[in-house]
């Protein structure tokens, strides 16, 4: 079942920019925080998780991309970006990511 934010996160005023995502409790390294973006065809949708995360050059989460394959051979494109913690995150710490969709 889809939830806008995991129970371990909340939205608060950020020292980085505007609002940000913050840990309500300790989050262990390797935790899947959920879906941040979904691409259907040419349209990219941002979830609340993706909408409130701020940039950092030293992020504590990274994105993983899941590309769905349609075995019925009906034409569609489907990609899902999830956020995975790179290290243990302390309660009260802001969740950040490096803003890129590709590497150069």
Describe these PLM feature segments.
Residues 1-104:
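Conserved catalytic SET/PR domain of SAM-dependent protein methyltransferases, capturing the structural core
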């Amino acid at each position: 079942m889809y939830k806008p934010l995991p129970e371990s996160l909340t939205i608060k005023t950020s020292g980085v920019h505007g609002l940000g995502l913050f840990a309500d409790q300790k989050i262990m390294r390797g935790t899947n925080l959920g879906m941040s973006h979904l691409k259907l065809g040419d349209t990219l949708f941002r979830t609340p998780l993706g909408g409130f995360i701020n940039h950092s050059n030293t992020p504590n989460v990274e994105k993983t991309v899941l590309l769905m394959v349609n075995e019925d051979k009906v034409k569609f494109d489907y990609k899902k970006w999830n956020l995975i913690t790179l290290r243990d995150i302390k309660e009260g710490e802001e969740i950040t990511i490096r803003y890129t969709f590709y590497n150069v």
